[in-house]
Amino acid sequence: MRLPPTLLCVRTVLSGAMLFLIVVPGALTAQDTAKAESEKWISLFNGKNLEGWTPKIRYHDLGENFANTFRVEDGVLKVGYDGYAEFKETFGHLFYKDSFSHYRIRVEYRFVGEQAKGGPGWALRNSGIMVHGERPETMSKGQDFPASIEVQLLGGDGKTPRTTSNLCTPGTNVVMGEKLILAHCTNSKSKTFHGDEWVTAEVEVKGSEVVRHLVNGELVLEYNQPQLDDRDAHAKELIQKAGTKMLSSGSISLQSESHPVEFRKVELLDLSK
């Protein structure tokens, strides 16, 4: 059917618009690719041993890797409990040697096997990335968790929804929507990951300004003003030493909470430069 001149003009304009829409995304993709290539991610885990990392396991001295809790096998950083007769709340953390303020940390993790005997019910398929944490030297021998911001990693139980990359706050608080959050844990909006598939968790930390949680590249949680909780006795001591409750930098550590977990990548992008 022959189109009137006005409709022909409209079709020509629309065709041009469609062409624009087709071309521009390609340009953006190339730009994003160039940006990704320019990002200088460094691996915090060498795939061979625990060089650069120090264990702090409850009831044990700093540096003592009780029952070989943290080990490297087949190029994978593993957290296991085959050397435990019973867990007995022997929570542990593997600390990286340096502290950071502005950065992105990215891990690939999965839960495997069965929970250690005596592990608490809430710790089933549970681990975490601790950011803006205290240094392990300031922890007492019987201290369970470092004062820190915890990016809680959870695996599905095969039945119910169970989000991952949630927020938990041992000795800390954060602000969301201009409201101080006092609840210990806040769920993200991630999907549930059942089974033993590998999941990519990323955390973007910008000093005391903002922290963002991403799962497989999707933003699932965001908050501001990470800070020590002056209601907590140990955190109060840290506030007195630092002269402020605001957390602008701190340690990074990985948890052992009674369920075997594996990390095949632990990478960091320094945003301070």
Predicted regions and their residues:
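Carbohydrate-interacting regions of secretory-pathway proteins
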Residues: L28-K273
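Compositionally biased, intrinsically disordered/low-complexity regions enriched for serine, proline
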Residues: M1-R2, I22, G158, L167
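Bacterial N-terminal signal peptides
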Residues: R11-G26
